[in-house]
Amino acid sequence: AEGITITSQCIRVPVLNGHTATVFVKFRKNPTKEQLIEAMTSFKGAPQELGLPSAPKQFIQYLEEDNRPQVALDVDFEKGMGISVGRLREDSVYDWKFVGLSHNTVRGAAGGAVLCAELLKAKGYITKK
């Protein structure tokens, strides 16, 4: 998005699956919390628009609970291909901060690679010989 500044930090913790990131965001025009949640949860990228088999139907879910997302509870959202976001709060330096969770081996590796191949095929970059 135009005029957006983002910083983030990922801390590796001993869990079987899942990467958690704390993200700090600054906008030129500060949106409301409701606008941010709507933008995240309604986002659809090319994989969703093309209806690719490995694409999650809902790419990002927002969790209202103060202690979410959590690896044990949320890492398998959309069979591990979706992103869970929560703890959206105003920030005194940036405009907003939130926590994001993704499945590192499904979304980040194997499933992500399959989804990339599906997208390349759908866009005509991979064809039969």
Task: Please state what every model-predicted region is.
Residues 95-129:
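Generic C-terminus detector
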Residues 1-95:
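C-terminal substrate-binding/catalytic lobe of Rossmann-fold NAD(P)-dependent oxidoreductases
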